[in-house]
């Protein structure tokens, strides 16, 4: 059986067929307009002709993503097998479209969904599009690092008990910083309550290929998971999988929802990269992840010896009551150097050409993957030692991290506020108003305010703090204003009437 499985997993149905087409030298009277790259010399000189030959638009024999019956279907079946799932769907609009599709296909208007407040913006957008009612659960907060972590079982159990009519529970596995929740216990309890369990696994694709990383959503029993193959497992940016198992998912409705959200011209390059990356991770993932975990362990040992720096490890995580942690995330606290994470991020990029994943007020985040090398780690250590040499003891350490993770009071469903009459107000004068748009810091793309929440002074202070320290504020307007509900012209304001949809 194992040999048969390996024979299957050694295949790349879509990529193989795509290569056959590219090598057949067709006369193109179809789109795309570059016609196999005939007039794209500047880009060809850099990336090569083959990229254009592979950039086809579903010619005969290459199947259709919206209704797969041939090589795409075969490739998705192999992906499902590799990822311990019943079905797998290719996503060429990123995990974002997977999260949109799972929530929209499962939750109808006004149906409740239990989810952590530190969800990605795509989950909030799905609430707006579906009309579902969020029941937010506060994540565990690490006040020393200034980050939101996973969910405890007790907090989710309390929400399930209080809202037994909820349709689904949504879990992040893991967070941007690699922290996981008690996903097995949460899933089992939610299933006992008759709820569907969804997972945002944007940063956990590699969990399926190593027992030394946290448990994956499918292995934990979740019904559906969106996982970014491109973030940690080697496919091209914007390519992901949507995985399902069990009998709780309406696959016909799910496919229909995906077809509503996906482009009708999906990138063959992205699909091919998913096909090939799946094969590579199946055969090489475990060994490569083992090697990079060894590098990560050595990196932590070295960083701990650098004056003014601290690095998170599993001992730190467990001592603070968190469940598990992806050790391929190097969370490095730099505030003892007297500089912010934002300053360290810029210094490492400008002086050492090191591109980190993100910065927060007191820390920086470096993401390792199966492709990280010893030379990469050595270069990072040299750069961190340089930071320490230049800043430690020269400047005073930063004050204790300012991180309250204030939760604004919810007044209405996100959908109601999004469609309500609006007006523009200065962000500095928005206290007490009902938000009509999302306001977030990016990365990581977690909204500090969502439509339907009452903007508090505490949230405004948090936003100002991030902006003053170099973060990018994402909102709809660029004139210092935000959109809020025009309460005087909104019949719902101080009314018991509910919107119909």
What do the PLM-derived regions correspond to, one by one?
Residues 145-206:
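Active-site phosphate-binding strand-loop segment of PLP-dependent enzymes
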Residues 298-477:
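Conserved C-terminal alpha-helix-loop-beta "cap" of PLP-dependent enzymes
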């Amino acid at each position: 059986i194992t040999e048969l499985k390996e024979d299957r997993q050694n295949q790349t149905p879509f990529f193989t067929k795509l290569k056959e087409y590219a090598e057949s030298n067709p006369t193109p009277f179809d789109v795309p307009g570059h016609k196999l790259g005939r007039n794209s010399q500047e880009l060809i000189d850099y990336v090569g002709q083959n990229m254009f030959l592979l950039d086809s638009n579903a010619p005969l024999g290459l199947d259709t993503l919206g209704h797969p019956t041939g090589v795409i279907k075969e490739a998705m079946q192999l992906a499902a097998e590799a990822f311990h799932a019943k079905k797998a769907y290719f996503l060429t609009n990123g995990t974002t479209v997977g999260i949109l599709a799972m929530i929209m296909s499962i939750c109808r208007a006004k149906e409740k969904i239990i989810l952590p407040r530190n969800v990605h913006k795509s989950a909030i957008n799905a609430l707006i599009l579906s009309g579902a009612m969020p029941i937010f659960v506060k994540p565990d907060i690490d006040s020393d690092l200034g980050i939101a972590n996973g969910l405890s079982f007790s907090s989710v159990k309390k929400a399930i008990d209080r809202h037994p009519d909820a349709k689904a529970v949504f879990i992040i596995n893991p967070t941007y910083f690699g922290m996981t929740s008690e996903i097995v216990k949460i899933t089992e309890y939610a299933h006992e309550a008759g709820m569907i369990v969804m997972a945002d696994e944007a940063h956990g694709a590699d969990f399926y290929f190593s027992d030394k990383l946290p448990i994956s959503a499918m292995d934990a029993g979740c019904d559906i998971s969106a996982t970014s193959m491109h973030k940690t497992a080697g496919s091209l940016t914007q390519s992901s999988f949507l995985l399902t198992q069990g009998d709780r998912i309406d696959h016909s409705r799910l496919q229909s929802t995906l077809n509503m959200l996906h482009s009708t011209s999906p990138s063959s390059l992205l699909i091919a990269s998913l096909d090939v990356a799946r094969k590579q991770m199946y055969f090489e993932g475990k060994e490569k992840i083992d090697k990079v975990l060894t590098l990560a362990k050595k990196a932590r040992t070295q960083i701990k010896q650098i004056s003014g720096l601290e690095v998170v490890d599993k001992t730190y995580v467990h001592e603070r009551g968190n469940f598990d942690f992806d050790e391929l995330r190097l969370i490095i606290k730099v505030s003892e150097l007297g500089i912010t994470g934002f300053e360290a991020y810029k210094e490492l990029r400008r002086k050492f050409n090191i591109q980190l994943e993100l910065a927060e007020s007191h820390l920086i985040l470096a993401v390792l993957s199966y492709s990280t090398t010893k030379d990469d780690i050595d270069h990072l250590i040299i750069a961190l030692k340089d930071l320490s040499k230049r800043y430690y003891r020269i400047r005073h350490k930063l004050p204790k991290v300012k991180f309250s993770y204030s939760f604004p009071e919810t007044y209405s469903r996100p959908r109601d506020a999004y469609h309500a009459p609006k007006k523009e107000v200065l962000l500095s004068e928005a206290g007490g108003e009902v938000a009509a748009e999302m306001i977030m810091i990016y990365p990581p793309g977690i909204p500090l305010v969502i439509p339907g929440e009452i903007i508090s002074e505490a949230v405004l202070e948090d936003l100002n703090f991030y902006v003053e320290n170099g973060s990018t504020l994402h909102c709809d307007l660029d004139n210092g204003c935000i959109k809020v509900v025009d309460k005087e012209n909104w019949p719902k304001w101080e009314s018991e009437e509910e919107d119909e949809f």
